[in-house]
């Protein structure tokens, strides 16, 4: 049984990028995060390393269970995200309706350690991200899972998200 209180989010550090890269290479993660292949994988690594500050609006975290690193998550202000060009994503199409900063935030998450899959941790991660976005003053949370990613969609729906369109799930929080 998972103890919800032992799950925490801590900012991703430079030394965590190797672990994140290892998780990206796992088939069950790669198929959802990198459906367009290696260019998309490299884009993920560029975003988490953020060498030139271009991705400062992306907030990256590692998910811990106690002291063990078990996953990754992020949130991003969609006002800035809609300007990002990334293969496989049309953020302008998704978030063109976002007209102000600090209103709508996109979230993403993964469980990198297989033994922690199917234990309800995704639901807890979404709740912890929601708490962070509320603390920022956000009003809406968005997620863009593939429609084939049934587990992720069920996690979002169980957290109060509603389907706006294929690959666009939203939750009003304030």
Regions found by a protein language model. Give the residues of each.
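A short helix-loop-beta-strand connector motif used in the catalytic cores of GNAT acetyltransferases and
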Residues: 48-62, 71, 79-83
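Conserved acetyl-CoA-binding loop-helix of GNAT-fold acetyltransferases
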Residues: 118-132, 154, 158
